[in-house]
Amino acid sequence: MNYNWDWGVFFRSTGVGSETYLDWYITGLGWTIAIAIMAWIIALTLGSILGVMRTVPNRIVSGIATCYVEIFRNVPLLVQLFIWYFLVPDLLPQGMQDWYKQDLNPTTSAFLSVVVCLGLFTTARVCEQVRTGIQALPRGQESAARAMGFKLPQIYWNVLLPQAYRIIIPPLTSEFLNVFKNTSVASLIGLMELLAQTKQTAEFSANLFEAFTLATLIYFTLNMSLMLLMRLVEKKVAVPGLISVGGK
């Protein structure tokens, strides 16, 4: 294919104010990172709680966590996003509806919807990783803690979870990378994250190949950097004698 690449397009004016196409990418990357970080905070927090719930010796508690996982893991992310953005606001009390629909600007409401949606969707996956990490520990860990007089919350907080987190760093890293990639669904509800800015650049500049090539390089560089960083963290906190789940 005889195609003349024009990489200088990113430094040209978009025709909207004084912005260049590169400015659009920077703005989109900022939204992508913000969505991913906020969603990951939700996922790691709730996923840890539900992961613990799935391993406690109480059928009701573990059953609640199991139901959550099965529901959120088996409904497509895009369907969940549309539910959170179009349906859930109409189910809120009138005061919250007015705040969400009238006081918030469309960008903020879209941001909140995608953060909650992606956070709760990823929670189900993190829950399973935490459960696997806890169950991978030697049974003697819990028995020894009980013999020392630890109560169940103390056993999880002081003994099981610190070790479980260390051995599930590889799969948690994969989930974190998935969060970054899944932020692209935000473009479907009007949030101008990286993918949306890429499509807008392609439409305005007519440089389709350059626009999506740059987006691909940004996603690849970001995810590879995170993966390499987490490999260093994994080596730093590795527990001698324990094998990482999904690792070597």
Question: What is the predicted role of each segment?
Answer:
Residues 1-248:
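Transmembrane alpha-helices and adjacent helix-loop boundaries
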